[in-house]
Amino acid sequence: IPATPGMEIRGVTEMFPLNGPSWSLFYEYIGNILYALFIRRLPTKVLAALVLLAGCGLAAFAVWGPYGDICAGFSLTGDNIAGGSLRLLFSFSAGLLMSRVFRPVKVKGAVWVCSLGVVVLLAVPRIGGEENYWMNGLYDTLCFALAFPLLVYLGASGKTTDRTTARICKFMGDISYPLY
């Protein structure tokens, strides 16, 4: 059960103070309910419009919002509910859209290309500072709107052909959920 900001004793207003990452599962439940009731029935063009609208909303939240990023959703405050909902609507709908229109391309070493891409993107420190939140928001927008979907597309197109890569991928897959 989510904790309201007044009930959370550490003062960081986490929705799930005993298990911080559970906030994302909270939004996944909402996404699954929306999918079951509405989103799965949307025609592909309407789904694309939803992705575009949610992406624009999330970009506006990142660039002009209170944090200068999309790190929101972990608390039951207005800003966090708005940010978390936009994150859910964009990523969930974009994933569904990608699954509908996906046509694989040949990518040699996709797992290594995608891994390097993720490391490079996540290694960039916060940009701009308190006076220029918009700069980091713009970087976050470029990541979620262009870079991350491209990495997912390339990764989904790739095939592991050698034993070493297959073993590494299996190991990473096996530990990903327990670490989460």
Model regions: which residues?
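Membrane-interface helix-loop-helix regions
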Residues: 1-29, 57-67, 71, 78, ...
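Alpha-helical transmembrane segments in multi-pass integral membrane proteins
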Residues: 8-11, 38-42, 71-180
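Short active-site segment of divalent metal-dependent hydrolases/proteases
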Residues: 30-32, 90
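Small-polar-interrupted transmembrane alpha-helices in polytopic inner-membrane proteins
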Residues: 46-66, 114-122
